[in-house]
């Protein structure tokens, strides 16, 4: 570190320009040339608010204030943003809040205390390690922050329950933990599980290196300065020379960090041309140190317990377990992670459709509700009008019936009364005739009187039985029955799809299309019963593999692994997978997860080469497995040969059949040579489609091995096109 000189007056030290009262570390960070050092640590701890006024979006922390006179680049103008940053952030220094600094022609004029905040550039509550300025749409930050303090931390440690906490929160838990003899019981704040940890001031928990790397990358992209002040990251020293110079390269073969002089002195021999060199990284060195045996390095992975192992851990705790090398473990976990991502993308497609459907349904509720209310109102108004019309008609019928009935009764009473009066007179006349003593006079009129009485009896009619009924009984109205009929016409409520209260919504179907790659090692000199066909050919020999229309993964539909959802009459539809699938049967095929009809059996679909690991004289290729049944794989690899004048042709190096694994390792390759690989699957119905051409270049003897873990670009593009 060079001598701290004042930027305003280089001829004097910064203490002469700045009063002793304001000789804080922040002022030193501004007024001295130490501001140009990117590894200068922050003068305050993480939990304090003072980070001064650094321009956090600068690639180098040289712009320290809103005034660009502090920047090394006078053309900065507070726009010294990196390509990945979107905004320019400043942080307020709480220790200099009452200081007013004025300048005149680039020289320090005075430093006056004031009751006002002179350096108030940003919010006083802004923390450089709190993700407050992050966009709300960022879902990654929730997995990077500590769940207790909700801050971004470069170093977090994993509990046995797989929850990660920062060191500060772990120390707080340790203070309040219950101590039992030489152990303290640590309770996870996330899942409330108890863990027995040794009572010590050292941290006996593995560090979550993946979260640390992702957090550092996140800070670099979003303008956080905390990653620059990481005290744990220091220079890597040479492990060979005594002067302990800074290491320049690391030899993977020798497992040593070498400076430039030692590299030339000990690795310039021809015998060491196959050694692999990589750049030195403190993160890689710390990650491979066993937490239980600091003197040993991690070199294997236990499949049984899913743990990283060193040589001592394997002998002591994992003897007899299924262990693999780190390279093969990375390959398997990469394939498993890719398969899990593919499964979720298939489920996410259905989830997005469901969410979109419900969002549309939710937004249409208000408009549909008003329309429905209007429809119900108009309907009941019509019903009321009909009832009122019926009431009017019935009332008129009752009135008319009463009037007509009264007329008929009056007519009957009048006619019958007249007839009765007439007959009463005739009867009185007949009674007087019976009193006559003269026979001639009686006999002269007796017959006539009898005939008149009988005729009068015959002409006297009985009343109509309908006249005896009451007028209200003529119009029968059972209002109780009408009310019940009306209630039955209207529905009581919406019908549910599942009437049983015990039934629960089923999960989304999982479309499993990938298998975890298994360990296998092949070489061109140890294939056993397998056949290798050697021949020369040009690019025309595999023109079908370059046919983009045939080889594109998007041209192949997803296998129908389950029946479509059954439609129901209700609002909700659930996936019914019961009875659709069968347990896997034991067979020699790779893939027998789903039951297919005989008509659906076909040749294997396309596969994807998702990972390659290339050495100077060897290469290892990993590929996925299609959804159809597979008996074996077949590979062809070509070498690109350059012939004068600048002509490039392909030469078939080998054709390998009956491969029973999802990876293949080839040896005896030529360094600094370009190779092309393609793979296809074979079953009883014949060979499937060739995969896309995978091009690799073997490095020279002094280069580093080239490997890509995780998803390759062709996997990502195929995944995006497919989903």
From Swiss-Prot:
Residues 603-701 form the Fibronectin type-III domain. InterPro entries: COS_domain, FN3_dom, FN3_sf, Ig-like_fold, TRIM42_RING-HC, TRIM45/56/19-like, Znf_B-box, Znf_RING. Residues 382-412 form a coiled coil. Residues 434-492 form the COS domain. A zinc finger (RING-type) spans 146-192. GO terms for molecular function: zinc ion binding. This is Tripartite motif-containing protein 42. Belongs to the TRIM/RBCC family. A zinc finger (B box-type) spans 235-280, 285-326. Keywords: Coiled coil, Metal-binding, Repeat, Zinc, Zinc-finger. It holds the Pfam family fn3. Zn(2+) binds at residues 290, 293, 313, 318.
């Amino acid at each position: 570190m060079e001598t701290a000189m004042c930027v305003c007056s280089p001829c004097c030290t910064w203490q002469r320009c700045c009063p002793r009262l304001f000789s804080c570390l922040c002022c030193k960070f501004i007024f001295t040339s130490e501001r140009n050092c990117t590894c200068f640590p922050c003068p305050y701890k993480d939990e304090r608010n003072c980070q001064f006024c650094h321009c956090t979006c600068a690639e180098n922390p040289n712009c320290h204030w809103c005034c660009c006179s502090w920047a090394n680049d006078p053309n900065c103008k507070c726009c010294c943003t990196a390509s990945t940053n979107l905004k320019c952030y400043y942080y307020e220094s709480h220790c200099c809040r009452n200081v007013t600094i004025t300048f005149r022609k680039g020289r320090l004029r005075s430093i006056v205390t004031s009751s006002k905040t002179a350096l108030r550039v940003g919010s006083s509550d802004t923390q450089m390690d709190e993700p407050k300025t992050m966009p709300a749409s960022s879902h990654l930050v929730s997995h990077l922050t500590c769940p207790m303090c909700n801050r971004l931390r470069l170093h977090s440690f994993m509990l046995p329950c797989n929850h990660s906490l920062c060191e500060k929160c772990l120390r707080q838990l340790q203070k309040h933990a219950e101590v039992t003899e030489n152990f303290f019981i640590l309770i996870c704040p996330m899942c409330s599980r108890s863990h027995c940890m040794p009572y010590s001031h050292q941290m006996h928990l593995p560090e979550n290196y993946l979260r640390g790397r992702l957090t550092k990358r996140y800070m670099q992209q979003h303008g956080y300065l905390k990653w620059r002040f990481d005290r744990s990251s220091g220079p890597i020293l040479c492990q060979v020379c005594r002067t302990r110079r800074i290491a320049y390269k690391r030899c993977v073969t020798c497992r040593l960090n070498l400076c430039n002089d030692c590299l030339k002195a000990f690795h310039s021999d021809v015998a060491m041309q196959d050694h692999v060199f990589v750049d030195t990284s403190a993160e890689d060195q710390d990650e491979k140190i066993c937490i239980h045996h600091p003197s040993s390095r991690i070199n294997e992975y236990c499949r049984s317990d899913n743990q990283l192992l060193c040589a001592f851990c394997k002998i002591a705790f994992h003897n007899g377990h299924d262990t693999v090398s780190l390279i093969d473990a990375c390959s398997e976990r990469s394939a498993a992670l890719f398969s899990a991502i593919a499964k979720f993308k298939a489920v996410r497609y259905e989830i997005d459709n469901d969410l979109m459907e419900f969002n549309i349904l939710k937004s249409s509720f208000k408009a549909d509700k008003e329309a429905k209310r209007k429809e119900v109102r108009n309907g009941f108004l019509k019903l009321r009008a009909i009832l009122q019309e019926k009431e009017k008609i019935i009332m008129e019928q009752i009135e008319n019936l009463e009037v007509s009935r009264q007329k008929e009764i009056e007519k009957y009473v009048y006619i019958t009364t007249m007839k009765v009066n007439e007959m009463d007179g005739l009867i009185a006349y007949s009674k007087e005739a019976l009193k006559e003593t003269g026979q001639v006079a009686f006999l002269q009129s007796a017959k006539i009187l009898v005939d008149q009485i009988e005729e009068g009896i015959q002409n006297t009619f009985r009343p109509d039985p309908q006249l005896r009924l009451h007028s209200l009984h003529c119009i029968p109205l059972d209002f109780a029955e009408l009310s019940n009929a009306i209630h039955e016409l209207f529905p009581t409520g919406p019908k549910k799809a599942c009437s049983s209260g015990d039934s629960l919504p089923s999960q989304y179907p999982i479309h499993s299309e990938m298998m975890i790659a298994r360990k296998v090692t092949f070489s061109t000199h140890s294939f056993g019963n397998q056949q290798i066909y050697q021949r020369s050919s040009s690019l025309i020999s595999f023109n079908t593999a370059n046919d983009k229309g045939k080889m594109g993964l998007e041209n192949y539909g997803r296998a129908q692994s389950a029946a479509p959802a059954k439609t129901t009459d209700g609002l909700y539809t659930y996936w019914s997978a019961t009875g659709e699938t069968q347990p896997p049967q034991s067979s020699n095929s790779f893939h027998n997860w789903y039951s297919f009809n005989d008509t659906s059996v076909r040749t294997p679909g396309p596969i994807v080469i998702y990972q390659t690991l290339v050495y100077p004289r060897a290469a290892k290729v990993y590929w996925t497995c299609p959804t159809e049944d597979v008996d074996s794989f077949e590979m062809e690899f070509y070498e690109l040969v350059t012939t004068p004048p600048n002509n490039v042709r392909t030469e078939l190096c080998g054709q390998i059949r009956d491969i029973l694994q999802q990876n293949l390792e080839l040896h005896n390759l030529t360094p600094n040579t370009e190779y092309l690989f393609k793979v296809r699957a074979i079953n009883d119905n014949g060979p499937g489609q060739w995969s896309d051409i995978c091009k690799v270049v073997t490095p020279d003897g002094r280069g580093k091995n080239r490997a890509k873990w995780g998803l390759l670009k062709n996997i990502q593009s195929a995944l995006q096109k497919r989903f």
